[in-house]
């Protein structure tokens, strides 16, 4: 299985690897630290399921639609 590492810059300008494809899809749902209430989708190991996202923080296993979730993680 091919995993692709992508990089992003943090505010402190260090370059860090993002979660790999496989890692992202294996993370648990995480509503984050804020108190808003946004419907998002996460991959639960079998399929994509809804959860409530607080609006900030959390992890990469959150998607705006079920379709986006399945496109990224459906074959994980």
Swiss-Prot record:
Tell me where in this chain the BPTI/Kunitz inhibitor domain is found: 25-73
In terms of InterPro entries, this protein maps to: Kunitz_BPTI (IPR002223), Kunitz_BPTI_sf (IPR036880), Prtase_inh_Kunz-CS (IPR020901), TFPI/VKTCI-like (IPR050098)
Q: Which GO terms describe its biological process?
A: envenomation resulting in negative regulation of voltage-gated potassium channel activity in another organism
Q: Which UniProt keywords apply?
A: Disulfide bond, Protease inhibitor, Secreted, Serine protease inhibitor, Signal
Tissue and organ expression note: Expressed by the venom gland.
Which cysteines are disulphide-bonded?
A: 25-73, 34-56, 48-69
**Cellular component aspect of the GO annotation:** extracellular space
Please give the Gene Ontology molecular function terms for this protein.
Answer: potassium channel regulator activity; serine-type endopeptidase inhibitor activity; toxin activity
Subcellular location per the Swiss-Prot or TrEMBL entry: Secreted
Signal sequence residues: 1-21
Cross-referenced SMART domains, in alphabetical order? KU (SM00131)
* Highest taxon, organism lineage: Eukaryota
Q: Which SUPFAM superfamilies match?
A: BPTI-like (SSF57362)
Where is the site described as May bind Kv1.x/KCNA found in this chain?
Answer: 27
Per the UniProt record, the site (Reactive bond for trypsin) maps to 35-36
Family of the protein in this entry: Belongs to the venom Kunitz-type family. 02 (native) subfamily.
Q: What does this protein do?
A: Serine protease inhibitor that inhibits trypsin at a molar ratio of 1:1.
Note the PANTHER family from the entry.
Answer: BPTI_KUNITZ INHIBITOR DOMAIN-CONTAINING PROTEIN, KUNITZ-TYPE PROTEASE INHIBITOR-RELATED
**Protein's UniProt name:** Kunitz-type serine protease inhibitor HNTX-03141017
